[in-house]
């Protein structure tokens, strides 16, 4: 900074404004670096709290493949409780889900700030946008088939019962569920930032906020239990 120009500054506000005007790039870079550092810190903190294993979840899902869907949910639920008795809810509560143009129903099995686990699916055909999140998402197919595609790819990728798809962090896809498609969906990462995906569809598209309120109740209850009782973020 020019020394003689500095002498003309009479107070701190003038000095601060002059500093900002002369160093916008430095300040912008500093803010960006701070945001990235905070995100990395949160990510590391959350990943240390991961309890659910994708290999175990896949094996649990296979217990229900080929069974009538009610029996499949029961069998998978029991397997999950056997492996994670302290983290899986004992009761299944179903509610409507709208997000990214798709509609189905879901049942919350586990929810914390770093992980979620749900049953999800639809007896009808449904398609939409996956959303783009700060988390990884796994869909373990129980029944039916889901299809997905990515930008620049012109053939769909099919995932029948017994298989699973993986959506990396900050990647989006188009997808569809064929009629009577059901899955066990697992996400790990910064879970709270995914809530607007569900919220905005409930408020601005369907005008039905009841499912969202129900989801907030079930998810909030599990998150609170994990934080206060199990000391899990």
Swiss-Prot record:
Residues 45-93 are extracellular. One of its GO terms (biological process) is ergosterol biosynthetic process. It holds the Pfam family ERG2_Sigma1R. Its main location: endoplasmic reticulum. One of its GO terms (molecular function) is C-8 sterol isomerase activity. GO terms for cellular component: endoplasmic reticulum; endoplasmic reticulum membrane; plasma membrane. Keywords: Cell membrane, Endoplasmic reticulum, Lipid transport, Membrane, Transmembrane, Transmembrane helix, Transport. It is found in: Endoplasmic reticulum membrane; Cell membrane. Residues 1-23, 115-233 are cytoplasmic. The chain crosses the membrane at residues 24-44, 94-114. PANTHER family: SIGMA 1-TYPE OPIOID RECEPTOR-RELATED, SIGMA NON-OPIOID INTRACELLULAR RECEPTOR 1. May function in lipid transport from the endoplasmic reticulum and be involved in a wide array of cellular functions probably through regulation of the biogenesis of lipid microdomains at the plasma membrane. May regulate calcium efflux at the endoplasmic reticulum. Belongs to the ERG2 family. This is Protein erg2 homolog. The lineage of its organism: Eukaryota, Amoebozoa, Evosea, Eumycetozoa, Dictyostelia. The gene is erg2.
């Amino acid at each position: 900074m020019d020394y003689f120009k500095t002498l003309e500054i009479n107070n701190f506000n003038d000095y601060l404004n002059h500093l900002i005007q002369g160093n916008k790039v430095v300040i912008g870079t500093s803010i960006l670096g701070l945001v990235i550092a905070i995100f990395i810190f949160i990510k590391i903190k959350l990943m240390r709290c991961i309890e659910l294993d994708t290999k175990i979840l896949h094996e649990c899902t296979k217990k229900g493949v080929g069974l009538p869907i009610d029996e499949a949910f029961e069998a998978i639920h029991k397997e999950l409780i056997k492996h994670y008795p302290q983290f899986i809810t004992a009761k299944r509560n179903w509610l409507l889900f709208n997000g990214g143009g798709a509609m189905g129903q879901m049942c919350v099995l586990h929810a914390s700030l770093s992980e979620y686990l749900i049953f999800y699916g639809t007896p009808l055909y449904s398609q939409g946008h996956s959303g783009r999140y700060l988390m990884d998402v796994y869909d373990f197919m129980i029944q039916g088939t889901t299809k997905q595609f990515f930008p620049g790819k012109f053939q769909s990728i099919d995932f029948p019962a017994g298989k699973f798809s993986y959506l990396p962090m900050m990647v989006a896809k188009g997808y569809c569920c064929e009629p009577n498609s059901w899955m066990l969906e697992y996400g790990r990462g910064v879970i709270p930032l995914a809530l607007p995906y569900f919220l905005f569809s409930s408020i601005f598209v369907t005008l039905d906020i009841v499912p969202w309120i129900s989801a907030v109740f079930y998810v909030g209850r599990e998150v609170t239990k994990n934080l206060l009782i199990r000391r899990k973020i």
